[in-house]
Amino acid sequence: MAFASASNGAVRFTEEQEALVLKSWAIMKDDSANIGHRFFLKIFEVAPSARHLFSFLRNSDVPLEKNPNLKKHAMAVFVMTCEAAAQLRKTGRVTVRDTTIKRLGSTHFKNGVSDTHFEVARFALLETIKDGIPASMWSPEMKNAWGEAYEHLVAAIKEGMKPVALL
Amino acid sequence: MAFASASNGAVRFTEEQEALVLKSWAIMKDDSANIGHRFFLKIFEVAPSARHLFSFLRNSDVPLEKNPNLKKHAMAVFVMTCEAAAQLRKTGRVTVRDTTIKRLGSTHFKNGVSDTHFEVARFALLETIKDGIPASMWSPEMKNAWGEAYEHLVAAIKEGMKPVALL
């Protein structure tokens, strides 16, 4: 599903931002399972209670670090986030697979995900990317490019979280 | 006001934990203004929307880094947090100046501070202390001691956030 920015115009994402995202994603891609896992462990380090938002963690005694469902979920979310960022400029839209953005919106709404949770995930994502690429590649511009791409994804998910107006 | 742990028993805080807190607080104390400021800037780095919880930030155009009210507030909160931690074992209670814990509870309740906000502040506090003491002094035990002291303070504030039952 394609999703335009809140203004309903095309997403603004410069060539330079796209180049930074593509360059760093190319480096991280092959290690998505581990980097995605670290992304989620960072979220839970900052906000331990966020684990209650995930059904497969609520009813599990397995430590977070060893939970296979978390590893699988974390990789899927990380890859989706990075691919949406990588395609942002080309498509001018947040692009994820069909129906996924609707499901994401509804799941996040149902589970009571708050603005602060989205912010914690943003912080965790940027910290994880910083540690996932060579130190010489990290810069304020790189941080900004990923931060903006993430904000576009969140705007799309939040749009999907809005209850449908009843006629 | 003195506040016991949730179990209404004395707070458990070991001699070792107290020693770690006292040792690191002694080093940070003289630089409380700067370290406290960094503590709050870290909170806003992780959760930018948390600035709306503070009346003196909501209506200000001054950048966070330069806001004198934030500097003042941050230092007061940091010193209170560290002093409560330093006195925890000796008193067996979270001890802050008279009426402060009630005011804290009521202010946090009124402004809609959530569990996630308290978690973000915990993460920011631990990161700030890590950077505020010599690297050789930081350890899992040090992190644990400050983390536990902070949890006791938060439990006291949350107790003060509960609406008074009506008879």
From Swiss-Prot, chains A, B:
Residues that hold heme b according to the record: 55, 73, 103, 107-108
Keywords associated with the record: Cytoplasm, Heme, Iron, Metal-binding, Nucleus, Oxidoreductase, Oxygen transport, Transport
Marked site positions, Homodimerization: 143
Pfam families for this protein: Globin (PF00042)
Domain of life where this protein originates: Eukaryota
Main location: cytoplasm
UniProt motif (Homodimerization) ranges: 45-49, 115-127
Catalysed transformations (reactions): Fe(III)-heme b-[protein] + nitric oxide + H2O = Fe(II)-heme b-[protein] + nitrite + 2 H(+)
The protein's enzyme class: oxidoreductase
Gene Ontology MF term list: heme binding; metal ion binding; oxidoreductase activity; oxygen binding; oxygen carrier activity
Obligatory cofactor(s): heme b
Keyword 4Fe-4S among UniProt keywords: no
Cofactor: how and how many bound: Binds 1 heme group per subunit.
Entry's induction text: Accumulates upon salt (NaCL), drought, cold and asbcisic acid (ABA) treatment. Induced in nutrient deficient conditions (e.g. Ca(2+) deprivation), but down-regulated in resupply conditions.
An example Gene Ontology CC term for this record: cytoplasm
Subcellular location(s) per record: Cytoplasm; Nucleus
Protein family membership: Belongs to the plant globin family.
Role, per record: Phytoglobin that reduces nitrite to nitric oxide under anoxic conditions (e.g. during flooding or in waterlogged soil). May not function as an oxygen storage or transport protein. Has an unusually high affinity for O(2) through an hexacoordinate heme iron because of a very low dissociation constant.
Subunit structure: Homodimer.
Record-given protein name: Anaerobic nitrite reductase NSHB4
